[in-house]
Design a protein with these regions (language model features):
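Carbohydrate-interacting/catalytic domains
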Residues: 118-121, 130-140, 144-379
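Conserved alpha/beta catalytic core and glycan-binding cleft of carbohydrate-active enzymes
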Residues: 1-154, 183-255, 262-263
Length: 379
């Protein structure tokens, strides 16, 4: 029945999508009916079910589980963020943050996050940045687009009164910017269902809770470099491998002030060094914002520099400010945001190098060996 239904829908309504919410490992849910795949020689699984897409329940569960943990313990669970790439291209996946995750006492996405109010909003921005740059289409339940505090109740409305306050407006601006980025950057949508659209730079720096990866489109010029920092401290002079020399423009920073962040970043661009790392011929020396995600794109300007040169950490996200109305700040900024201000120099002990973890993490016991991630996801 399902195969016949999907065949009929796509034949008669080619602009319609059928999407399966399915939590088993049944193969070929989003493969064509005449797929020809097989599982254990079972004739029933020789053909696909013909759905256009399928929910990625594994990604949802592992990712939310990681984000709910205090940053002190996240380094022990780095593989929860990288494991989804082992199977990300087995189906045409949708990344779902649905109503199922914000009902029956589970709390809203915002309330799941650890830390004070500022850290909760920064974690939510980080989650959305990861979601929008991860292969797969996006599903976000109502209320998530502005960071509702309370979980969904079917007998009432969502909390519209909170939607126009400072940090919630920042989340709305962030979602708008991520949607614009996804529509205008081919690397974020052209190869969502193809393993060639994703490539790891580094997935195993669990001590700093850092991930770095590439997204590829059909044109090599569209390649994006994404860097993720899952700790509440900035990492200065952090070296990340790069596939090309020259200049890399910072086209997105989840810590931009228009999103409610602290404007820690890279002044809008970084010039590559000709000293390679992570198996790449070049490298970028970056300032990673606390609980922040950065997206870079190569531009045709200067060649790689011969020697590293530290730069002050201050990003440019001014284009986003022009595109969206500025939110009215409260007369007195929330106390929780004060420790994260970019203007205040970070204590020396909190400055993170690639060779040492932040001070906040130095006193804990030796970490178990992080699970290694494969260099590339299977098709």
């Amino acid at each position: 029945f399902l195969r016949q239904l999907n065949q009929s829908v796509y034949r008669d309504f080619p602009d319609v999508q059928t999407i399966a919410e399915e939590s088993t490992a049944w193969p070929g849910v989003s493969r064509p009916v005449a797929w020809g795949g097989h599982s254990n020689d079972n004739p029933e699984t020789m053909n696909g079910l013909g759905f256009g897409m399928k929910w990625n329940m594994g990604w949802m569960h592992d990712t939310l589980s990681w984000f709910e943990k205090d940053p002190v313990y996240r380094s022990y669970h780095q593989n929860a963020l990288s494991f989804s790439l082992y199977y990300a291209f087995n189906e045409n996946f949708v990344l779902p943050l649905s109503h199922d995750e914000v009902v029956y006492g589970k709390g809203s996405l915002l309330s799941k996050m650890p830390g004070d109010d500022w850290q909760k909003f920064a974690n939510l921005r980080l989650l959305y940045g990861l979601m929008w740059t991860h292969p797969g289409k996006k599903l976000l339940f109502m209320g998530g687009e502005f960071g509702q505090w309370t979980e969904w109740a079917h007998e009432g409305s969502i909390d519209w009164n909170a939607a126009d306050t400072y940090f919630h407006v920042g989340i709305k601006h962030l979602i708008g910017a991520l949607n614009h980025l996804m529509r205008t950057q081919p690397a974020l949508h052209q190869r969502d269902f193809d393993g060639s659209g994703f490539e790891w730079i580094s997935a195993d720096d669990s001590a700093h809770s850092v991930l770095a990866y590439l997204r590829h489109g059909n044109d090599p010029k569209d390649t994006l470099l994404v860097v993720f920092n899952g700790t509440p401290v900035p990492h200065h002079n952090y070296r990340v491998g790069a596939p090309q020399g020259g200049r890399w423009q910072e086209i997105f920073n989840s810590d931009a002030s228009i999103y409610g962040g602290t404007d820690v970043g890279n002044q809008g661009f970084v010039d590559a060094l000709d000293e390679g790392t992570h198996g790449r011929p070049y490298s970028l020396e970056l300032t990673l914002p606390p609980l922040g995600l950065l997206v870079f794109k190569h531009v045709d300007t200067p060649a790689a520099k011969a020697l590293p040169k530290a730069k002050a950490a201050k990003p440019a996200a001014e284009s986003a400010k022009a595109a969206a109305p500025a939110a009215k700040k409260p007369e007195s900024a929330p106390a929780a945001a004060k420790p994260a201000k970019a203007e205040a120099p970070a204590p020396k002990a909190a400055v993170a190098k690639t060779s040492a973890a932040p001070k906040a993490f130095e006193t804990r016991a030796a970490e178990p060996k992080a699970a290694e991630s494969k260099a590339a996801a299977p098709k």
